[in-house]
Regions:
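OB-fold and OB-like single-stranded nucleic-acid-recognition modules
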Residues: 1-96
């Protein structure tokens, strides 16, 4: 059985401003509601970029892993402010 590794470091595909890539970093709160509950997260990546998570297709809940090191695979879209949006297809929590 040949499985595709979603974390292949060399997997970067350009298509209409979108890149399929792997990102590693610390998952941090990015957005809060009026009751101070976290409603959005981003990844402060080891490449010194910030990736704002727009969606997560993985069954696991990213919010359970805030302040943890994560490795995510997904579609990255560059924003006009220099940050990036990411649609996460798969993620794993890394050992500290």
């Amino acid at each position: 059985m040949n499985q595709t590794n979603p974390f292949r470091e060399d997997k970067i595909v350009k298509s209409k401003g979108m890149h399929q890539r792997t990102v590693s970093g610390i998952l941090i709160p990015e957005k809060w509601d009026d009751k101070n509950n976290v409603i959005g997260v981003s990844i402060q990546a080891f490449d010194e970029n910030e990736y704002i998570v727009k969606s997560c297709l993985d069954d696991k809940d990213l919010f359970d892993f805030i302040k943890k090191k994560v490795k995510v695979a997904g579609k990255v879209f560059e924003r006009s402010d220099g940050k990036f949006n990411i649609e996460v297809n798969h993620f794993d929590v890394m050992d500290n």
